[in-house]
Amino acid sequence: MTEQTENATRLARPLIRLAKLVGVATSYVGMSHDYHEIEDDVLVAVLGALGIDASNDEAINQSITSIKSERETRVVAPTVLHVVGKESKVEVHGGMFDVPEASITLENGKQFTGKISHEGGEKIAHEINGSFFFTSYLVLPADLPEGYHTLEVTVGSETETATVISAPEKIELLDDMKNGSLWGWMSQLYSIRSKGSWGVGDFEDLKTMLVEAKKKTGSDFMLINPMHAAEPVPPLTPSPYLPISRRFINFSYIRPESMPEYLTLSHEDRAEVDALHEQVELLNDDARLIDRDAMWRVKKHALWVIYKAGRTKARQAEFDRYLAECGDEIESYATWCLCYDKWGAPSDDADNWVRKYNRDSEEVAQLREKFPDTLEFYRWLEWVATDQLHAAQQAARKAGMKIGIVADMAVGVHPAGSDVWWNPERFAKGATVGAPPDMFNQQGQDWSQPPLNPIALEQTGFRVYRDMVHGMFANAGAVRIDHILGLFRLWWIPEGKPATDGTYVHYDSDVMLGILALEASRAGGVVVGEDLGVVPAYVSKSLSEHGILGCAVEWFEQMDGVFRTPKDWRPYALASVNTHDMPPAAGYLEYGHVKLREQLGLLSGPVEEFQKSATAEHNAMLNMLVEEGYLDKAALDDEAANENEIVDALYRGLKGSPCKLMAASIVDAVGEKRTQNQPGTNNEYSNWRIPLADGEGNVVPLEKLFDEPRLQEITAIMRG
């Protein structure tokens, strides 16, 4: 039997002790239950990315001493989690006879008048540089209200402050989910176009989709791809999971004609905007790849026309309120956009502006002064985008949807994006985020995104994460967290290493889940965590305790080649037949995943072995559907001829689950077979550029989408 733990000799090594001290994993167990110990060079590099010197034995010992000393001498930790309705103990440090004095300023600026008591701790002294420090506890009362508060603690002559995140214990289910379930659709917004689109699906299309989906199918939500910000100038990164910022919205989704300012344009200006629209209108009926760049070159010109025309006093007042709410964050984002606009795309060149200058550079200040109108334009674009996304959510709720938009939160951001450039101290330098090898991605994955630094998160009260979650719930009824395991641990890959040579770095999941619970509860929303793949039992337990739904994918609900019957799936999950990283149902049944991976050279073994495994999986799924009564066995005699019936059976199985949320895929409902995204590829495959089309390759326009016979057949199954 393979050893599954590190031996005592290894655990005693200073490098291993240092890594464990700061939450860097020194071993892990993979998806196939294979045990791995992390090589020293990987640990040294990852520690370096955290800002911890482990370059030699002396540095390692010094780092251990320094970290322990800082933790044992600080008055209070910079971030404290409190659960509303319960007492919380906060560790404080001081001399043996010191009695801490504490006060709390609530987020509204008022002083908390409740009682903060003090308890003694263990009478064990920690000697640091000749002084002795003891641990005691402040007890925060159960009646401390929810919110982000400031705790001030004085011990002796030292005073320090901490951010108190006072959150509900868990997220309550919506009333309609407590004794039943809700169903909806999942889609890639950019792929669904109407006659009014500019070649790419936009916020007006989203509004129409939401209202039509409720009216014609009775669904209660629409899960869409991430709406995070993209580049301000072409070329635009196709992947919505590699944004330049997770705090702001992709303004290329704006519909110019939906703005109040469009209606008040002069005859000449409106004619110019309309003529620009006509330049890309034909793209809406093009079944070839989505062309974001062609769209944005033209649409941006139109938006400049509208921007220069001005706005009413009332609209200007709305704009001013938006800027005040965003604070400095909008300045960082707009400034980055301005630099990109005037100096070109970021690159790895040492002379490129993104490497040469920072937020405090004189050159950046001069650029802002030279182009105030362009700077204001980018602020304005973000306001308009936020306004239109919010309007789509409001329309969904007005139409009767219980949830409306399910927003998707990406794992990270572009390494040269605005978040990283303006606030590099928030991120780890010299590492990227990815995933270790598994059965679907045998070479592992490198997502080319710098990870948030967990040390910086704690020191800043998790402000960046709080703002991001708050912003998403402002325009959605639910948030799906992509790779929610990342709130517990992320796979860090040192710069220059393959995805296989990484390790896990742990985060303070209790605090991050607390933030989710606080923001979701305030918004009356739902949180879904994408928890597919290798998920430790403690993660599943914690998500459940916090009221966060997991994900159940029909093709993944199996153990040792045997599919679980849908009625045995866990109830607290968002269930679907497939994901955006798989071919649609019809394509998967035709082994599109095998063919594509062979074509792209993504298999680590012979294609015959992968095909054999895929065939066994395929047959096991169909057998389960037959045995459970979802599929007539006669359909197996000619699978190609009975493709629709088999897809319907997959959805009957989905509907037969007890899951609180169930999502039908728009691509399945029109017969699409092409894969939207193939993990492990970049330019080798046309990821995130596949327009919505039927099985014959014909574009399905939004105007006809919800009247499609196949979609109505899937609807009938989901409505039960």
What does each of the following model-derived ranges do?
Residues 1-224, 262-267, 521-522, 526, ...:
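Carbohydrate-interacting/catalytic domains
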Residues 48-110, 114-115, 122-148, 153, ...:
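Acidic/aromatic-lined carbohydrate-recognition and catalytic surfaces
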Residues 109, 233-386, 412-661, 667-668, ...:
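Alpha-amylase-like alpha-glycosidases and glucanotransferases acting on alpha-linked glucans and related
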